[in-house]
């Protein structure tokens, strides 16, 4: 097994019998919540929105899209926040594109940049090029001075196919970083035991995560808090401030702007968190526990 590019003892892979909450220093029935922000670095509006959500609102961590156009701006405004790498091999917007850091012909679409859809990616991507590209994104974030706390794939692109999931877990082990994994998909639906495979490699991940990517987070977040289960639950949002730049992408911007108002300005979220009994944490707690095992 390899960590930070160096071989380490196989005992690192031993799976603890304690619950994740217990490994984080809490009781087994504790309800811990990670409120994460996606797409830091994608837009200027996202950078301002995400940092406001972290510093003024209820969010606890975020993930950086290293190949995206505003990534360097996000880094320039970084101040030790709990930030992971949003492993990116798709570019979903028709008029706003980004592409690989590395030479990766199989990750280029006909219109330039990464493929727009997951199906297009899955049809053409070479796993070796996906591995090299994703490793480069993590390395770039570290070189920029980000204290990387976790890995979270953009659009779940490398989670739900075995050949790309292998890449995901290899990098999690190499850099000793926890990962985001959906809990609402069964092994039968995915076609392979992805959560079991990650656990067997000693990779930590939240107990609960609903990978619902439909627009708008308000009701989904409130429903998750009303029905909070013991363990670690990740809930994701995508906050952006209201600017002409983000409005130019179309109606999809409405949900991102609402996410911002909800997470930063809406007292109902703070009340829902208090009513749920949630203990708010970030991914850094999982990373530190993973590296201590």
Provide a role label for each language-model segment.
Residues 44-69:
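A short alpha/beta connector and helix-capping loop motif
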Residues 2-34:
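N-terminal pre-catalytic segment of deacetylase/amide-hydrolase enzymes
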Residues 180, 249-293:
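C-terminal domain-boundary segment and adjacent tail
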